[in-house]
Amino acid sequence: MENSRILSCKYRTSFGSSNARRIRSKDEIPAVVYGQGNDVLHLKIKSNEFNKKFAKFTDNTVLILDDGKLERCVFIKDVSENIASKLIYHIDFYEVDRRVELEKYVPIKLIGASVGVKEGGILTVLKEQVRVKSLPLDLPEFIELDLTPVNKGDSVFLKDLVLPSNVRLAENDENLEVVTIK
């Protein structure tokens, strides 16, 4: 597991606005974890640890919350922050079972310079994300699509995407166009 995905956390037993302010004054962020049919867990996370890693997170980044005894597999559901001061007020995490496959939309990242575009063709992107199915820890943050070999008049379909091992398409029609060059 990448260390950049692991966040240390501690349980908290005090709640409410004044307690949240007290937590933030100690350079910690109040947070909750829900999902998996469990009760809501109230946590606090070190601000500096979260802020260092937060810029690298996407909607598909699976994080591991580690309290020293148990590791929870979570996604960030919501981050409440003051836009002017960049102070994070609160984080909501959604817990998933790391042993159960899930379906999630993943962005398609276009790379390379297409031969067809170099020849004067116009690239049209028809699909910016794709629904995939995998275990949470295998979920990619994006799917790369190399445009280098795509010629003028060609299309790339969902079935042409190169998916990481342990990841498969969850779309109904694999013959949908992702990009076309005309």
From Swiss-Prot:
The keyword Metal-binding does not apply. One of its GO terms (cellular component) is cytosolic large ribosomal subunit. Pfam families: Ribosomal_L25p (PF01386), Ribosomal_TL5_C (PF14693). Keywords: Ribonucleoprotein, Ribosomal protein, RNA-binding, rRNA-binding. Signal peptide: none annotated. One of its GO terms (molecular function) is structural constituent of ribosome. The keyword Ribosomal protein applies. It comes from the Bacteria. GO terms for biological process: translation. Part of the 50S ribosomal subunit; part of the 5S rRNA/L5/L18/L25 subcomplex. Contacts the 5S rRNA. Binds to the 5S rRNA independently of L5 and L18. This is one of the proteins that binds to the 5S RNA in the ribosome where it forms part of the central protuberance. Belongs to the bacterial ribosomal protein bL25 family. CTC subfamily. This is Large ribosomal subunit protein bL25. It comes from Borrelia garinii subsp. bavariensis (strain ATCC BAA-2496 / DSM 23469 / PBi). The gene is rplY.
